[in-house]
């Protein structure tokens, strides 16, 4: 049985036999997790724990990049520094180094411990700026909710009492802050009575009932630290927020 083979079929066989070279696209950013930046007392001074950060950075290491320090939320009761790496990678694609830092929660240590941890992370990044291709003069801080509070405090609180631990020869100052729905005045939460407030995240952070100790609570709030010397702020907050009131 004879069959006529058309020219188009011959060319089809020819192209099917050709080897097509496809180069894999190089990633635009890299991720390194679990970098220990400090050690701190935990469980009220009875143990020691490593504080770690995750780093997302552009693949091109031929120049220095501005750095965004990310602080996750969790009502100071829990936190997961790696929870948001997927969308934080967008910043690395735009030319930022992103460092997501760990801090002690309120069941491990009370204020100012979490702020001291964040500032220790900032100092560590400055101390290792060359290693991580960071421009030490362009470090900003960003965080959500409880992390937004720590973002405000990291940008505003300059008293040396908040800088403890290693790398003290480096500054923990930041050049910009972007808090997302941050608690800024603990007295402004709508608790009906002191007994209800005793178990609030703010009271657990301070180790004191913020309704019974309003002056001490205010002394730990970002509104008490605002000055003309503060770096630029971009505050992001939804008007219908029922967890952190918009008035904060």
Set out the residue ranges of the language-model regions.
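Alpha/beta-hydrolase superfamily serine-hydrolase fold, recognizing
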Residues: 1-248
